[in-house]
Design a protein with these regions (language model features):
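PAPS-dependent sulfotransferase catalytic domain
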Residues: 1-125, 135, 179-232
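Hydrophobic/aromatic-lined pockets within catalytic cores
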Residues: 46-50, 118, 142-149, 162
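PAPS/PAP-binding and catalytic site of the sulfotransferase fold
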Residues: 124-149, 157, 165, 214
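Structural helix-adjacent loops and short alpha-helical linkers that scaffold large soluble proteins
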Residues: 149-152, 202
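Short, glycine/acidic-rich hinge or "gate" loops at secondary-structure transitions
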Residues: 153-157, 229
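Short acidic/His-enriched helical or mixed secondary-structure segments at domain edges of catalytic enzymes
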Residues: 159-184
Length: 232
């Protein structure tokens, strides 16, 4: 990875799922955090987990120098989603978290960035806002990064990040798309919508999530994760 970054001639970027307290923070680097309703995060995670090839999970668990608990293979079938939500809400892979199984707690992850959202080199972006106003959010991100907008090609860029465009170009757009990680690479881009959990999990489960989000994140962050809205 480091060799790839060193070889880039354009601006370097790293995508990570690490919380802010899990990375080295530098004033000269700009950070973008993308938030989402935790119930939507679960739906996306559930699809990715069941779409990963078992041999890939095994290889990740046995990578040289790997630290931390192993990633579990999916428990049951993709249709067992309601039981999976209960596990996600009440189990953890790490001693310092109480939820997020089998990967990490989205709520803890979001809270670490939220605490420092006032810093000039942290931009808070919400998935819902990206869907509703793709053009506006792309311009906001471009301004934050100091990237000039070329109006001659701008609409092509906006069209290029649409769900249908990325799904049709999944081998190039999906993480690991060219590395045979997924059972179905195009299924990495599964739906690209929010609120799919409605009618899938029960009202009791949804309420349990809302209660946990309020406890772990506080009212402001819990509300932002659910509804979005620009922070500036």
């Amino acid at each position: 990875v480091l060799a790839q970054l060193e070889g880039l001639t354009n601006r370097r970027y790293i995508k990570t799922h690490l919380p802010l307290d899990g990375i080295r923070f530098l004033d000269e680097i700009k950070y973008i955090f993308v938030g989402r309703d935790g119930r939507d995060v679960f739906m996306s995670m559930w699809n990715h987990w069941h779409n990963m090839k078992p041999e890939v999970i095994h290889e990740m668990n046995n990578a040289p120098g790997r630290q931390g608990p192993p990633i579990s293979l999916p428990l049951g079938g993709v249709e067992d989603i309601a039981a999976g939500f209960d596990d996600w809400l009440s189990r953890s892979s790490f001693d310092w978290e109480t939820n997020g199984f089998p990967f990490f707690s989205h709520l803890h992850h979001a809270a670490t960035w939220w605490e420092y959202r006032h810093l000039p080199n942290i931009l808070m972006v919400h998935f819902e806002d990206l869907l509703k106003d793709t053009d506006g959010e792309m311009r906001r991100i471009s301004e934050y990064l100091g990237i000039s907008v070329n109006e001659d090609i701008w609409q092509d860029l906006v069209d290029g990040v649409s769900f249908n465009s990325m799904k049709s170009n999944a081998n190039n757009m999906a993480p690991g798309g060219s590395q045979d990680i997924w059972k179905d690479t195009s299924n990495f881009f599964h739906k690209g919508t929010n609120k799919r959990w409605q009618g899938v999990i029960s009202q009791e489960q949804s309420s349990a999530y809302a209660e946990l989000a309020l406890k772990e994140c506080g009212p402001e962050l819990a509300q932002w994760l659910e509804f979005g809205g620009r922070m500036d």
